[in-house]
Amino acid sequence: MAWGFSDIPEVVVDYVRGVFAAANDKVSRAMDVYPSMHEESLDHLLIMELTAAPPAFFANERIGVAIESHWLGGRWMWHRWEIADMAFFVILRRHGHLQIRKVALLQTKRLYSREIPVPELERADFEIGIGRIADRTDPSRPLSTRRQFTFDGGCVYGAIHAGDHQMDAIDAYFDDRGIPVYYGFYNPTWLPYSA
């Protein structure tokens, strides 16, 4: 019998939502403490939190569930474009046999504070991906300099806006493959926020 989403017991859905909510909370709290944290570090923190969630067994439903996460950042997935930063798999088994596997691709963007300029990105930033960080030569502030970070409704998510080439590539990927790519937005636990 083929399983659909409606066949997944509510207790399992609640468990998976809880694991993702706890991981999201951990990442948001990291932005509270380290407001200038790089997006890639936030990606790794999210993956670490999800990976740390052990598989769970629901005795009444006789179902085991595991969540697997994989970082994809920097990989060319579509015509030399990075389409997603990470992939998640939610796997349900009964008596050791696969019942259903759900896959989600996630493209993440972080909210930039008023004090951190949103970097001007070039096409190569998306084509090369994370490897582009090694090319940076821009000056940085001394670590001993005190800084203020303010997040409010006027802040923007870096590298995402209507008509953006990366967003166009993600849309084309979906049209061709039929695999949706979701957007994850990193921000502090509340707005406005200042640290």
Regions from the PLM with identified roles:
Residues 55, 111-195:
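Acidic, metal/cofactor-coordinating or nucleic-acid-engaging core segments within structured domains
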Residues 81-85, 101:
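Short connector loops at helix/strand junctions that flank enzyme active sites
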Residues 93-101:
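Short, solvent-exposed loop/turn segments that connect beta-strands within catalytic domains
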